[in-house]
């Protein structure tokens, strides 16, 4: 399940991102057929997301939600294939984050179709897409509770994170895409500053906040802190 702080922090970003993304209706020259789950309504997506559970008793809901997320990932793969100057449209985002982004929008727009929402999401992702192939590195750390955590990430995303951390005075090393102790500490400092668990791992929510406009970061940090205090 997605944590309350994850959900609260992401919601501020989702609202502002979709507000700026407005997608026009298809024109005669731009019409295309929508396959499968893309025609489902936001209401159906929200229902499947709310009912999903690892419990076998809710296997149907799990399958339904997985079908929606699978459609989203397939759509994004198509974007990677056909959008010019693009290798990966979503280089650090995860299925969990897709669910939060789409879910927050769908709760407020129940009659929209899934494909419309995903089109809008793609527009918000375009500026931060990975344009060229990049090596990947798997990072494994123990969090403050001694639990093992890991993430696989592009070295180009590490470089981008180092650059943003340096701009905020949280990292003084080289911006070279190489993961090291200083980079880990910089990520942890940033996470603590915005109210996230300071694992030091560049997880999707951390990167989403880090790469977002400063005002959005502050709003999201306030939401995360508020949610954290309610636990």
Predicted features, each with a name:
Residues 1-10:
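Bacterial N-terminal signal peptides that target proteins for export
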């Amino acid at each position: 399940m997605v944590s309350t702080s994850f959900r609260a922090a992401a919601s501020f970003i989702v609202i502002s991102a979709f507000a700026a993304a407005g997608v026009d209706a298809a024109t005669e020259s731009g019409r295309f057929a929508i396959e499968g789950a893309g025609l489902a309504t936001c209401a159906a997506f929200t229902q499947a997301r709310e009912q999903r559970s690892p419990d076998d008793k809710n296997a149907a809901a799990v399958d339904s939600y997985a079908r929606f997320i699978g459609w989203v990932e397939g759509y994004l793969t198509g974007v990677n294939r056909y959008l010019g100057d693009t290798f990966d449209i979503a280089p650090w985002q995860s299925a969990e984050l897709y669910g939060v982004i789409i879910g927050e929008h769908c709760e407020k727009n129940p009659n929209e179709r899934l494909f419309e929402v995903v089109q809008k999401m793609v527009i918000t992702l375009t500026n931060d897409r990975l344009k060229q192939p990049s090596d990947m590195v798997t990072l494994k750390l123990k969090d403050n509770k001694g639990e093992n955590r890991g993430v696989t990430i592009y070295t180009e995303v590490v470089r981008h994170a180092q650059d943003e951390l340096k701009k905020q005075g949280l990292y003084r090393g080289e911006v070279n895409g190489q993961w090291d102790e200083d980079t880990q500490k910089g990520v942890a400092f940033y996470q603590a500053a915005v109210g996230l668990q300071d694992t030091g791992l560049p997880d999707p929510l951390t990167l989403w906040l880090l790469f977002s406009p400063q005002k959005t970061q502050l709003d999201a940090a306030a939401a995360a802190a508020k949610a954290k205090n309610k636990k």
